[in-house]
């Protein structure tokens, strides 16, 4: 998938795994942005600690790169317990889940990324574990098989997903705390860039941090990734200081424009304008013309374009807006202006 090649993609890249933990906040007061989510979690954590109970199960959903994994770490740190991490695709059989659950200590946090990808048979084991802190294990085979209930310690399940609509209702209803993570403001991202630069021992001027923030598509993971690229440019082409000019030159070299669009975003918009003459276009036609999978276009490329007002999803297909024409320096045909 193209997401693995995009510096402005929200999904985690291999390079992020080595650097991201060093800049990740460990306590909730260091976490920038998502004020409503922070306040709700802080309140729930404090209440659970006062009662000396486990925290209620937490579901975090929203676009990739907004801090779901970071929040799971913070929850465990604030509760003073161990964090166990896994993901939906890894838990293939009920036995895999049972092995994880039986190793938990009281009040531990179990973080399941991509929880929407759990299989139905695994979910069936998870339901009693979440509600009653028990799991049913089948011992034996055939007529001799019997179900045995095993008690497990009270724990907190933190589920993360970018596709909340794919969660089954029974699973979603078992989460006591459900929070959506929103895209970050430019000001919040500038704070994150400045904080990360300080941790990494970099010198970043406020205008330099702001320039990186503007092109980060509202996503901290992208902001930190762009910061590392600008750092390289500043050290090789400049004096090591990240200024607005250095950030602009570095990001232009990476083909990330002032609004955070990359060449794949522009390619999609130009395709709709030039090849399809701005008419409504179905997703399958776009997929064939771009040579990309439908899911990649829907989940990776389109969301940011829709959020920024460059693209509209209609029952008849995808339509490019006047905003997209202006951004690309093109004049919108009169018939399209009338349609808008």
UniProtKB/Swiss-Prot annotation:
Major localization class: cytoplasm
User: So which domain of life are we looking at?
Assistant: Bacteria
Task: Provide the reaction this enzyme catalyses.
Answer: ATP + H2O = ADP + phosphate + H(+)
Q: Which residues does the annotation say bind Mg(2+)?
A: 69
- Per the UniProt entry, what is one GO biological process? DNA repair
> Which SMART domains does the annotation name?
AAA
The ranges of region (Head domain (RuvB-H)) come to 258-340
What residues bind DNA, as annotated? 294, 313, 318
EC number in record: 3.6.4.-
Molecular-function GO terms, alphabetical: ATP binding; ATP hydrolysis activity; four-way junction DNA binding; four-way junction helicase activity
- Which portions of the sequence form the region Large ATPase domain (RuvB-L)? 4-184
One GO term describing the cellular component: Holliday junction resolvase complex
Q: How does the entry describe the domains?
A: Has 3 domains, the large (RuvB-L) and small ATPase (RuvB-S) domains and the C-terminal head (RuvB-H) domain. The head domain binds DNA, while the ATPase domains jointly bind ATP, ADP or are empty depending on the state of the subunit in the translocation cycle. During a single DNA translocation step the structure of each domain remains the same, but their relative positions change.
The protein's role, per its UniProt record: The RuvA-RuvB-RuvC complex processes Holliday junction (HJ) DNA during genetic recombination and DNA repair, while the RuvA-RuvB complex plays an important role in the rescue of blocked DNA replication forks via replication fork reversal (RFR). RuvA specifically binds to HJ cruciform DNA, conferring on it an open structure. The RuvB hexamer acts as an ATP-dependent pump, pulling dsDNA into and through the RuvAB complex. RuvB forms 2 homohexamers on either side of HJ DNA bound by 1 or 2 RuvA tetramers; 4 subunits per hexamer contact DNA at a time.
Q: What is this protein called?
A: Holliday junction branch migration complex subunit RuvB
Q: Species name for this entry?
A: Hydrogenovibrio crunogenus (strain DSM 25203 / XCL-2) (Thiomicrospira crunogena)
**What are the leading ranks of the lineage?**
Bacteria, Pseudomonadati, Pseudomonadota, Gammaproteobacteria, Thiotrichales
């Amino acid at each position: 998938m193209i997401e693995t090649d995009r510096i402005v993609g929200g999904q985690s890249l291999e390079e992020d795994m080595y650097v991201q933990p060093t800049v990740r906040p460990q306590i909730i007061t260091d976490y920038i942005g998502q004020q409503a989510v922070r306040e709700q979690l802080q309140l729930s954590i404090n209440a659970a600690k006062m009662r000396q109970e486990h925290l209620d199960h937490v579901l975090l959903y929203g676009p990739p790169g907004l801090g779901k994994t970071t929040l799971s770490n913070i929850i465990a740190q604030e509760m003073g317990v161990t964090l166990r991490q896994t993901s939906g695709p890894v838990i293939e059989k009920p036995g895999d889940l049972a092995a994880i659950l039986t190793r938990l200590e009281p009040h531990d946090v179990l973080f399941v990324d991509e929880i929407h990808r759990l299989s139905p048979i695994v979910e069936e084991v998870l339901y009693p574990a979440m509600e009653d802190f028990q799991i049913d294990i089948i011992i034996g085979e055939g007529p001799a098989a019997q179900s045995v209930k095993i008690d497990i310690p009270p724990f907190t399940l933190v589920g993360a997903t970018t596709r909340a609509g794919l969660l089954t209702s029974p699973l979603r209803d078992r989460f006591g705390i459900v929070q959506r993570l929103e895209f970050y403001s430019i000001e919040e991202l500038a704070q994150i860039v400045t904080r990360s630069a300080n941790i990494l021992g970099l010198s970043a001027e406020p205008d330099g941090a702001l320039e990186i923030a503007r092109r980060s598509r509202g996503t901290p993971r992208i902001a930190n990734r762009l910061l590392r690229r600008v750092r390289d440019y500043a050290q090789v082409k400049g004096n090591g200081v990240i200024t607005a000019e250095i950030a602009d030159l570095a990001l232009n070299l990476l083909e990330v424009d002032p609004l955070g669009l990359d060449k794949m975003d522009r390619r999609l918009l130009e395709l709709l304008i030039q090849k399809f003459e701005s008419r409504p276009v179905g997703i399958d036609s776009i997929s064939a013309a771009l040579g990309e999978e439908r899911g990649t276009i829907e989940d990776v490329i389109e969301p940011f374009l829709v959020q920024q007002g460059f693209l509209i999803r209609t029952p008849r297909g995808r339509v490019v807006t006047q905003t997209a024409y202006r951004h690309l320096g093109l004049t919108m045909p009169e018939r399209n202006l009338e349609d808008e």
